[in-house]
């Protein structure tokens, strides 16, 4: 919502709140005469935690809800043990009558998120009587752990795929509502994700621990009849999305790191992507250009360099091969490439002051642990 990197606005962990002085896109849209609404699906995006509701005429988050029996269960089983056992049995049961849904219905577990069906229902409700023009943010969480997938999609599919299918159907319902209310023709729809997911790639599952492309590369779709049906191969960034939308409607910009993608010509391919791992899981930072990636583990003082054109799956660390004297490696070329990327990465990092840590209460810590954001 800010067009900034986390190190810039200071919110580097979930559960932290955005400073009120930071400009947000919803405020810019509202100032430009747009009706604004947001519908989010996970507790740490509730305004009381994130402070992201600023600028929205209506922000539906449900707030954080903690069931009465859940704290008892969480004291019997530590989070890691419970998550291990729960992960093994949560989908046991016929159709929708699974262990997960049973425990959730009894109030014995709190998943801190709601289903795509609930999110779509709220978004459709916000579209009732909406004034044009409007800016809407609709956030789905089902593909993220603890993954909400109805039993009908679990037949013959793994849980991740089933959750994707569920979200796909709900996005379709939302688009159908735009059509039914004759809003689709004048609405630019943007679809994206905040991160990818490691599904066993490079020996990891989940996200936030590494900077491999399976975690960084996300879909970005701009859908409107006035736009050409084509795929843009140039590297772009999620921080460019809101600056692009504000620029398209002539609203004031955010003065942020992100830049509008469309300037009348082809999308530039030279936009560098800087990245950082989730702090709980390690101190990794990286720089990705259109053909190369440098990753630095600042805790372990290790680096990796990948030639993405020749090695798109990032299986070959050229720094290791160069040090080992592998025959097809030119050490001078590798060192030169590393030094250039390292200089750019250092330049980016030097522009930030030390992040001031925000304290969160015990309930928020418990919520973040349940969602997998604590080691």
Name each region found by the language model:
Residues 1-375:
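Catalytic domains that recognize anionic headgroups
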